[in-house]
């Protein structure tokens, strides 16, 4: 998923440079149709019964679990912050006349994301999530600030690498903690909650930041995103203080 969020915008940015917007929409349609076709051949596992033999609840309320909600909220704020990058990088780069640098931003993001994910999972499993989460939140914050105040191609590429390290490395840890916070028969609910939080953060973040662009400009939406990352870190710290040490599902399994 992380690479898809990079490859798609990278292709879109390069098509935008040639004003191939119609072709871009047709490409998105083709990929969506391919996804639907592939989903038809996926085998869905049967509903797992609880230990007492009862079936899990289905419906809207089954999408939430109180134990997992705090970590989902942190994930929401993280993705909300990243929405400004995903939705407005091309427009921001065009305003700065840095369209080529925007493509390189995404390449740097992908490269550093793949490099860091090779070892951050092991660090989380051996030492604990805080040794990954707090440094990554700091790096993500710096990356957003660097992007907001960029004045050239080099700074934009550096910000891409920093955001790849920060946002790209910390999201699997949050997924691990959401799953680890619930009972085994609720792992599916927790996993669904994680992705719902990401989708909501991306959609609501793009909508709200889109309304902010005209009054404050693109630079300030990235500064606002950095503030939200700090808020997410504070919420995470409070939650970890309440829970203390908690056993984790192996993070490497989620990478």
Model-found features: residue ranges?
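Structural signature of the two symmetry-related core transmembrane helices
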Residues: 26-29, 131-146, 226
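Extracytoplasmic gate region of multi-pass secondary transporters
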Residues: 67-106, 113
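Small-residue (Gly/Pro/Ala) motifs that create kinks and tight helix-helix packing interfaces
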Residues: 4-16, 90, 204-213
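C-terminal membrane-cytosol helix-exit motif in multi-pass small-molecule transporters
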Residues: 24, 29-50, 235-240
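Helix-to-loop junctions at the C-terminal end of transmembrane segments
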Residues: 16, 116-128, 213-214
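A membrane-interface helix-boundary motif in multi-pass transporters
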Residues: 16-30, 211-228
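Juxtamembrane intracellular "pre-TM" segments in multi-pass secondary transporters
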Residues: 44-75, 254-255
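Intracellular juxtamembrane helix-capping segments at the cytosolic ends
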Residues: 169-182
């Amino acid at each position: 998923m992380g690479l898809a969020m990079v490859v798609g915008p990278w292709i879109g940015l390069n098509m935008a440079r040639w004003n191939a917007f119609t072709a871009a929409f047709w490409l998105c349609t083709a990929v969506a149709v391919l996804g639907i076709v592939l989903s038809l051949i996926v085998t869905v596992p049967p509903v797992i019964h609880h230990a007492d033999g009862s079936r899990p609840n289905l419906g809207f309320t089954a999408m939430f679990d109180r134990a997992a909600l705090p970590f989902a909220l942190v994930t929401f704020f993280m993705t909300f912050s990243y929405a400004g990058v995903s939705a407005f990088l091309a427009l921001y780069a065009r305003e700065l006349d840095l369209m080529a640098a925007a493509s390189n931003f995404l390449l740097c993001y992908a490269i550093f994301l793949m490099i860091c994910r090779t070892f951050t999972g092991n660090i989380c499993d051996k030492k604990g999530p805080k040794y990954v989460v707090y440094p990554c939140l700091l790096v993500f914050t710096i990356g957003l600030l660097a992007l907001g105040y960029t004045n050239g191609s080099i700074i934009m590429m550096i910000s891409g690498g920093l955001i790849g390290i920060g946002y790209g490395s910390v999201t699997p840890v949050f997924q691990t903690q959401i799953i680890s916070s619930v009972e085994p028969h609720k792992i599916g609910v927790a996993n669904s909650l994680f992705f719902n939080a990401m989708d909501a953060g991306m959609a609501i973040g793009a909508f709200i930041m889109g309304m902010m662009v005209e009054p404050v400009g693109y630079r300030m939406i990235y500064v606002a995103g950095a503030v939200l990352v700090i808020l997410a870190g504070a919420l995470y710290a409070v939650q970890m203080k309440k829970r203390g040490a908690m056993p984790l599902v192996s993070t490497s399994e989620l990478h």
